[in-house]
């Protein structure tokens, strides 16, 4: 499960996901990529499920890059607890993904297999996505 080794502060504000992604919007490593079309919090379990789906689909043929990392803690108060008395304890970690962000990249396999693998990975994520293909000039 992905999470930071150390953080300066245990708890964070929720924040807002306004606008489009500023960075990480184009393919940087691989030939094929999976791009987000909606703003969403993706937790570490969902990233891991998509990674496993990609790895099983491509077997030992290609290489996969994960371009997002869950570095935001999400807190939760215990069940049947009254309001107040401070913020709850961190429960899981999320990556804040805005529209346009490339989440996964891959290379080393044919285009049809890559698109099939990325489609399987996108089914594991709670978000609409688009498959990108690098145009070599």
Curated annotation (Swiss-Prot):
GO terms for biological process: translation. InterPro entries: Ribosomal_uL16, Ribosomal_uL16_bact-type, Ribosomal_uL16_CS, Ribosomal_uL16_dom, Ribosomal_uL16_sf. Keywords: Ribonucleoprotein, Ribosomal protein, RNA-binding, rRNA-binding, tRNA-binding. One of its GO terms (molecular function) is rRNA binding. GO terms for cellular component: cytosolic large ribosomal subunit. Belongs to the universal ribosomal protein uL16 family. Binds 23S rRNA and is also seen to make contacts with the A and possibly P site tRNAs. Part of the 50S ribosomal subunit. This is Large ribosomal subunit protein uL16. It comes from Endomicrobium trichonymphae. The gene is rplP.
């Amino acid at each position: 499960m992905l999470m930071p080794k150390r953080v300066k502060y245990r708890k964070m504000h929720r924040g807002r996901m306004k606008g489009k992604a500023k960075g990480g919007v184009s393919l940087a490593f691989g030939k094929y990529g999976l791009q987000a079309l909606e703003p969403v919090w993706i937790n570490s379990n969902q990233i891991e499920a998509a990674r496993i789906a990609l790895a099983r689909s491509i077997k030992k043929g290609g290489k996969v890059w994960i371009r997002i990392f869950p570095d935001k803690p999400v807190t939760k108060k215990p069940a049947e607890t009254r309001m107040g008395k401070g913020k709850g304890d961190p429960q899981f970690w999320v990556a804040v993904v805005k529209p346009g962000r490339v989440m996964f990249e891959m290379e080393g396999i044919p285009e049809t297999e890559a698109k099939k693998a990325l489609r399987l990975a996108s089914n594991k994520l709670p978000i609409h996505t688009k498959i990108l293909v690098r145009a070599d000039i």
